Structure formats: C-alpha cells, structure tokens
C-alpha cells in the first residue's frame, strides 16, 4: 500500500494549534489545490470530543468560507480527521499559512456567537448522518481553546520522518 503524505511527518513533534500545508497539486487546467492540516490538538495527547467535533464540522466550513474565500482562494472541503486531532481543508489557491490562521481564529469567534443548538446548519435527520450526536457546548469549548492559543505553523521539512525511521517502522 502506498504511504500517504500525512504519515511521513513525525506526529510526536507537531505543534497545536497549528496550520500545515499537507499537500499541493496542480489540476489538468493548471489550478493549484492546497490541502491544509489544521491541527487543533497535540497528537496522542489530546483529542476533540466526538459531539463537539461533529458540531464544529457543521459550523466550521461555512465560517471559514466567509473569512478565507476570495482573492484567489476557494475552499473545496473541510473534514475532520479520523484521529479527532484536527481537520483537513482542501482549497483552490495557495494562501499563506498566516492568512489561514487568521481566518481560522475568525471562524472560531463566529462559533462562539452561535446561541442555540437550533442554529447549527443541517442539523436534521435528512441532512446529517448522525443528527443526534451534537454538542454546541463542546464545539464552543474547542473554539475557546483555539482563541486562547497562538496558532502556529508546522513545516513539513521540520517534521519529516527520516528514511531510516520509515524503514524501521516498516513503511
């Protein structure tokens, strides 16, 4: 099985919260697609609660679009990581990490403005696969964590696992 890019970085050295360019690629028409690792929690030490991350998934994508789309950037998708330590964001364009971090903080401030669970988009049996698994309180706790922290930048060259380590891990 081919080694995915996300598994070539050392998760024991990742900062959180932090932005990382996980991957860039060109479309056949020459557009750049950038995938960002938005790391909310320190891997293997912290995790977002399932109801909170699910509610954040419903809120985060819209709020990030409000703050990041434009000036050559259009978000394609924002999805939670299975490990519950962050989100992946795929977009058209190449915004600087600082611009992404600023939009992330602004989106978290928007999460705190949501007053009631009934204001969570697509929170119904028709548009959500587990519509009963939500917590606005947990999502807002996550938002407070980000707003109370400096959002750092994780660089791939600083986190790259050396070839000998990958060989040792039999990857």
From Swiss-Prot:
Cofactor(s) for this UniProt protein: Fe cation
Enzyme class: lyase
Catalyzed reactions per annotation: S-(5-deoxy-D-ribos-5-yl)-L-homocysteine = (S)-4,5-dihydroxypentane-2,3-dione + L-homocysteine
Enzyme Commission number(s): 4.4.1.21
Keyword Lyase: yes
Residues that, per the record, bind Fe cation: 54, 58, 128
InterPro entries assigned to the protein according to its UniProt record, in alphabetical order: LuxS_sf (IPR037005), Metalloenz_LuxS/M16 (IPR011249), S-ribosylhomocysteinase (IPR003815)
GO biological process terms, semicolon-separated: quorum sensing
Record's keyword annotation contains Repeat: no
Keywords: Autoinducer synthesis, Iron, Lyase, Metal-binding, Quorum sensing
One Pfam entry name: LuxS
Cofactor note: Binds 1 Fe cation per subunit.
GO molecular function term, any single one: S-ribosylhomocysteine lyase activity
NCBIfam families: PRK02260.1-2 (NF002602)
Purpose of the protein: Involved in the synthesis of autoinducer 2 (AI-2) which is secreted by bacteria and is used to communicate both the cell density and the metabolic potential of the environment. The regulation of gene expression in response to changes in cell density is called quorum sensing. Catalyzes the transformation of S-ribosylhomocysteine (RHC) to homocysteine (HC) and 4,5-dihydroxy-2,3-pentadione (DPD).
Subunit structure: Homodimer.
Family: Belongs to the LuxS family.
Name of the protein in its database record: S-ribosylhomocysteine lyase
Source organism of the structure: Photorhabdus laumondii subsp. laumondii (strain DSM 15139 / CIP 105565 / TT01) (Photorhabdus luminescens subsp. laumondii)
């Amino acid at each position: 099985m081919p080694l995915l890019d996300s598994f070539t970085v050392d998760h024991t050295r990742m900062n959180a919260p932090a932005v990382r360019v996980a991957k860039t690629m060109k479309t056949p028409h020459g557009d750049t697609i950038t995938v960002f690792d938005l790391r909310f929690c320190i891997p293997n030490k912290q995790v977002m609660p399932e109801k909170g991350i699910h509610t954040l998934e419903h809120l985060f994508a819209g709020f990030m679009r409000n703050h990041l789309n434009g000036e050559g950037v259009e978000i394609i998708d924002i999805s939670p990581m299975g490990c519950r330590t962050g989100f992946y964001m795929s977009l058209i364009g190449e915004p600087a990490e600082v611009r992404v971090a600023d939009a992330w903080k602004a989106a978290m401030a928007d999460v705190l403005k949501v007053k009631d669970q009934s204001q969570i988009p697509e929170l119904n049996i028709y548009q959500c696969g587990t519509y009963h698994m939500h917590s606005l309180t947990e999502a807002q706790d996550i938002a407070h964590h980000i707003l109370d922290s400096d959002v750092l930048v994780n660089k791939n060259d600083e986190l790259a696992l050396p070839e000998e380590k990958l060989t040792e891990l039999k990857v």
